[in-house]
């Protein structure tokens, strides 16, 4: 499936030859007139080729192609080999791996949630083959739901993305599934965390033809943790996770492509099976995602394509406390979308892309105890998006991108919101196309939010959508920088940026329990900084250095203040890591082993420090009309301690740094390959602080810290056949 266009052809007789590996050569003689436009449809017939040998000397870097063809967008890619090289906990993780890219901040070893250039984690649009995934994390955020064996590549757009992308304001993470080659194959693995398997192949040609396709290939995978099964004879292990994912790709004889992607996954943490007297705090916590998408693509004559997509996605979680009057909390969100995108190439220098989408979003939250519902809410809304963008390219000289996106949001409660979002990018090439200066600016909008307590290392996402009581987010952004290549091996870039956020939300600590409309508080924010990257693309030793500088702020009204109007409180959010450095390297080891190394250094993230405490006392009336100060029965008469806090997030944890290494080796067998691997997290056992707690009974109070991962060795085995 492809296209070509030849212009300024001298009139006369021409012989056209087309050849492709695995197909018979095609030859045709054409007569071209002075003003004649000749259209030619070519269909190659399959033909086996007998070759003495093929030597592949080099392949064109995808990073080089993006450098030449993208204007202002900041795009970083990791392929499967790079994902596997980055050391991790237990097994390769596509989402964990992007933490090593510039502009990406992670706040904890225990959370795979990421923050890009001063945006919160819910401001990242995460797409699996174009299907949005709301909360793609297992075990409270410890690692992601994506099976690395099903992934072809991961692409992060951390800024300056074009008008075709809407719905989030911070970044776009595109995860592309691998449909396989059509040959029957499989991958299986077992780690300390889970076991997984993925198989792929193609339907028989007769079956494919009966469905109207030239060929249909597929790949499906399953993953499950196994501790609950392993320990079941001895005791009930309370946790397990499951993932199921599939991708099916069909090609019609005319070259159209139909792709179907589906995913379902769930976590279950069940302590309700323990007898009442055996455990004082029983809970039943389960959460998961479901997603499905269909995409039809047709290549157009002269270049470009037409894509029509439909998808649906949902996320839900529930938390039950049976020992507290069956206290139950639940939250879920659903979305369904239909969209069409048309890409055309009217001339050799110009490209035009237009698209439209219709999306319905719905959420519901509830809180009940003792059979009575005390809180919660639900709402729905329709989002209509349209965009148009034009691209002018003068190879090795100029790249200009102009676009506009228009979003119309119709909530169930409130008025229709219309947000135009202009976007522009300019790129100028120098030094024969090896150096480029670029600038991009645009507006981005978002109508969905996730609420979570930023102080909790294991988060529980509560998704809500905008309405008359919940503002939508508007972010104006500008970025500029230089990037270039040195030979074919080295790529470097430096970018600065500024972002404003209007309509960020948080819980309202001063809400009126009798007023259901004041649960959410809207505010503003800013972020600015710079990202630097140096990357070696080829050779046995390769890798990159990424350095990020960031300053982020949030501003909300202080409704607890007695002043009118309420003063505003400005503070750095928890993901305001001022300096973040990542060094990643892949290198050959002895005896055929391949080593991977990651060293991460970051300044401390902010927290709210306790600066004092005081005892609580309570009066008791006694006989004779007097007062007696009493407490919990001891001589002090205290009833606990109150804590005096400093300004919000005005103190920072100590410097964070950690070294991780990995080792892999493949052993080829007649039927496939065995690949054992070892990961060693936090090699020198750095005690990075997760949070502090205080013992106020001591005088003076004693501060203690809870650390993140200690030195943590893990191993696993991968099988390919």
Name each model feature, range by range:
Residues 394-400, 497-500, 520-609:
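Gram-negative outer-membrane beta-barrel transporters
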Residues 592, 600-640, 652-660, 664-721:
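C-terminal beta-signal and adjacent terminal beta-strands/loops
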Residues 13, 17-29, 225:
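A short, solvent-exposed loop/turn motif at the edges and junctions
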Residues 277-296, 379, 443-493, 498-501, ...:
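Outer-membrane beta-barrel signature, preferentially recognizing the C-terminal barrel domain
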